[in-house]
Each structure stands twice: as structure tokens, then as C-alpha cells.
């Protein structure tokens, strides 16, 4: 059975799990240090969801909820389900818990992005009820002053 909780701070167990899980999501971003993870868990806008089963931590999700002039905005970020736990409903449980939590904080929509290459994840999001938005997503990178670019 999978249990989903919200971490209120970093622990050695959670930090070790992130060292294993983050590389499964991104090869360009290193796993967080213990202090970085603790800051994420404790940040007032964040809820850091942790899925565990009898084997240990099998997935995580970050929900960010913040007020803007047009309402309460909610974003799901960094959904990671351990390769060994995929296809067992962990991603669905994490997302459903986050959506319920966001609505409880006053959000009326929840957004997320997912690379097209993550086909299984995109199918899951659509089955849950997420819809593709008619919008563009842009990213601005901090210039590297050492190279002038």
C-alpha cells in the first residue's frame, strides 16, 4: 500500500531518496543538498509530497501555491516516481493528493508542464483530468557573465 504525506522538513531518509530519484527526472540538475531540500520542504509556498510503500520512498512531488492579483495559482513541479514503482498508481496518488491540497488552499486550477517525451506521464495527466492549454511556455536563462552569453 502506498501512503502519501507532506514533508515538513528534510530527513536523512528523504535526502537519500532524492539522491536516487532526481537523476531519474533530470540529468542536468543535481539532487539537492540536505539544506536545499530542507528549504524546499519548509518554504511557505511549497508542499512537498512524499509517496512511500513497504520498500521506502517511491515518489515525490512539489506543489507550489501562491497568490497573484487574479487569484490563487497552483503549480505542480518535479513529479518523480521511482523507475521500480512506475505503473503502480504512485503518480496518480501523488497528483490527486496535490490537487486536493491546492483546492483546499483556494486554487481553482492546477497547472503543470511535462516534456512530450515523457509519454506515460502525459497519458497519466490526461487520465487524471489535466487538459493541454493553448499557451506557450517560455524560459529565460540567467546570462553567464563569464562567457558574455
Give short role names for the model-derived ranges.
Residues 50, 56-65, 75, 80:
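Conserved beta-strand in the GNAT
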Residues 1-12, 143-149:
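Conserved N-terminal entry element of GNAT/NAT acetyltransferase domains
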Residues 81, 87-100, 123-127:
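Conserved acetyl-CoA-binding loop-helix of GNAT-fold acetyltransferases
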Residues 66-76, 86, 133:
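A conserved beta-turn-beta hairpin within the catalytic core of GNAT-like acetyltransferases
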Residues 39-50, 70, 75:
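A short helix-loop-beta-strand connector motif used in the catalytic cores of GNAT acetyltransferases and
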Residues 92, 116-134, 139-142:
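Conserved active-site alpha-helix within GNAT-family acetyltransferase domains
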Residues 9-39:
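Conserved GNAT-fold acetyl-CoA-binding loop/helix
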Residues 102-114:
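Conserved GNAT acetyl-CoA-binding A-motif
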Amino acid at each position: 500500500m502506498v501512503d502519501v504525506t507532506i514533508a515538513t522538513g528534510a530527513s536523512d531518509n528523504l535526502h537519500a531518496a532524492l539522491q536516487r530519484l532526481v537523476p531519474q527526472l533530470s540529468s542536468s540538475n543535481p539532487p539537492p543538498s540536505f539544506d536545499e531540500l530542507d528549504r524546499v520542504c519548509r518554504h511557505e509556498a511549497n508542499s512537498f509530497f512524499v509517496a512511500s510503500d513497504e520498500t521506502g520512498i517511491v515518489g515525490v512531488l512539489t506543489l507550489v501555491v501562491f497568490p497573484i492579483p487574479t487569484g490563487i495559482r497552483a503549480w505542480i513541479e518535479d513529479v518523480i516516481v521511482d523507475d521500480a514503482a512506475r505503473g503502480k498508481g504512485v503518480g496518480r496518488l501523488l497528483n490527486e493528493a496535490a490537487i486536493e491540497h491546492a483546492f483546499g488552499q483556494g486554487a481553482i486550477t492546477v497547472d503543470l508542464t511535462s516534456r512530450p517525451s515523457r509519454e506515460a506521464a502525459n497519458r497519466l495527466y490526461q487520465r487524471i483530468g489535466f487538459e493541454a492549454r493553448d499557451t506557450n511556455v517560455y524560459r529565460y536563462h540567467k546570462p553567464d557573465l563569464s562567457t558574455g552569453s
